[in-house]
Amino acid sequence: MPRKRSKPPEGSAFDAGLRLIAMRDHSSWEIRQKLLKRGHPEADVAAAEARLIEMGFLGDRGFAFQYVRRRSRTHGLLAISAELAAKRVDRETAEAALARVEPHAQVLAAHRLAHRLAGNTEFGSYRELLHKVGARLLRRGFPMDVARAACKDLWRGTPEEAEA
């Protein structure tokens, strides 16, 4: 439900939608919510959304593919899937976008991120490294096996590696 405003929104819902899309890609649901929040009438928002889709400026499929491509550099597929669901992208579209990410690319992203998260910290044991860096990778949506592989790469061959 749109919030009450003291004055009507400036410009058309279509123009406002174009400005939003010019800043970054949005899902259809996000555009709809933002336009309603800015006080545009429901009918104008629906017409603007339909026109943006018709002109090719708005579409959940394109949004999902771009979103996955951008976020997969720093997040695992589990987190990205949850984010797409929160943006109301349908499951089939989200799964198609997520399927395009190569497993090797996820492993490389986790390795790069693990190096960045560890920084210059010297860990006393592999378990400590796994506890601190591995846990952060898990929170970012990487699977356990990928987080462990990234941590093992950081640790590289010390005797405690066998403990894990």
Residue spans of the language-model regions?
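An alpha-helical, amphipathic repeat domain used for nucleic-acid recognition
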Residues: 1-164
